[in-house]
A protein has these predicted regions:
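Charged surface patches that recognize polyanionic ligands
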Residues: 1-78, 118
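Intrinsically disordered, low-complexity acidic/polar segments
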Residues: 12, 28, 94, 107-109
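Acidic/polar low-complexity flexible segments
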Residues: 103-104, 108-140
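Extended serine/threonine-enriched, polar tracts that run as long, contiguous segments within proteins
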Residues: 75-92, 101, 111
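Short alpha-helix boundary/capping segments
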Residues: 37-40, 100-104
Length: 140
């Protein structure tokens, strides 16, 4: 299970913060629950935001972050999916990741492979999550 608060930058208007809970269904599938929040840390969640979160998990009062990192994301939108290119800054290293996020059902794996082949890149099955990579980074 993982919690994230993502800051979405809007140069022309006020930035927004989105709280995401990632809860596993099985070894492959995760449910993702999202909502806008006013807080940029878990400790700053207001009672309404905490109540929303408590619908899905029990949130201990003394919860502490396991890791912190920053990701700059560029998004190329299409009718079927978003191609997301991430540059993530961990405490001890940076990494890069391309994600293909579905907007609607289609043969996304083939489409993603076509996009990657245009730049001589190859698809590899899912790498460890950013949370797992952040935890490994703390061991460096």
């Amino acid at each position: 299970m993982a919690l994230r608060i993502r800051q979405v930058l809007h140069p022309e208007s006020k930035d927004e913060y989105i709280l995401t809970l990632k809860k596993p269904l099985d070894a492959i599938t995760k449910y993702e629950y999202e909502r806008p929040v006013q807080a940029h840390t878990l400790g700053q969640l207001n009672p309404e935001e905490k109540a929303w979160l408590n619908q899905y998990i029990h949130l201990p009062e003394d919860i502490e972050p396991v890791a912190e990192f920053k990701t700059d994301r560029q998004i190329c939108q299409s009718k079927d999916a978003d191609l997301c290119l991430d540059h993530t800054f961990f405490k001890n290293h940076d990494d890069y990741e391309a994600e293909y996020e579905y907007r609607q059902d289609h043969d996304g794996i083939s489409r993603f492979r076509d996009i990657l082949s245009a730049v001589n890149a190859k698809y590899e099955k899912n790498c460890p999550s950013k949370i797992a990579r952040a935890a490994a980074d703390l061991q460096k």
